[in-house]
Amino acid sequence: MINFTIHGSCAGTSPIPGARHTSYCMEVNGSVYWIDAGENCAYSAHLNGVDLLATRAIFITHPHMDHIGGLGNLFWNIRKLTYVYKDEGMARMEGKTLSLRISELRSWHGIYEMLCCTEGDFGINFTIDAAPVMDGEIFRDENMVVTAHHNSHLIPKTEGDWKSYSFVIHADGKKIVCCGDIRDYAEIGDVYEGADLIFVETGHHKVDAVCNFFLEKGYNFGKLVFVHNGRRVIDNYEESLETAKSLVGDRVIISRDGMKFSL
């Protein structure tokens, strides 16, 4: 079973009560894997019962602030809890490697420099393996395989230097597609076929248009999960959900902060 928790369901809008910037995680066999790290993601996760010390990897779709604004604080909280839990925390994290996949390593270098100016110079007893995202397989462990597929949400300044990616995750016999921010749902090909969950966004799209895209293409899929939602959806939640269900039936979730579900 894969357990999902939504830490932030909001697009990069100005602050909206009860809706933080985009972040969610998957728990597989006791390990935690993150998709994006928007503001306050560690705070939300911890208070929602997610074990931060079980973090194995963090996958960033692209380096906009609404997707990385909480990244430094996430690592800070992991270190903090390592000490709060004393001997148990130290033992759990000793020699552990946390993987970070992010297309713009400059962002990570800046965040790390900031962390090194905090308590104890950010001395840690675990390793952070930061590597760039590129097309193809970017991560593999005993629980999952993750492949990246570039999209044109961010246009490269240099040919081929893509900074925005969608992810396909195979875990526990399931297929999950995380679109991230995307200009055109068609641009990453037929990766959606056979997916059990497809995380889609309405920060740049309308609910009915997204649903109709998948219906018209005829993809076989389990459920659409709307994250990175704009004000139109957040302010009109029930109406948006009704619209989606009128098109795809019960095969839809419009996420809210703190929401949990399993696959």
Each language-model region and where it sits:
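Structured loop/turn residues at beta-strand edges in well-structured enzyme cores
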Residues: 50-53, 96, 124-126, 142-144, ...
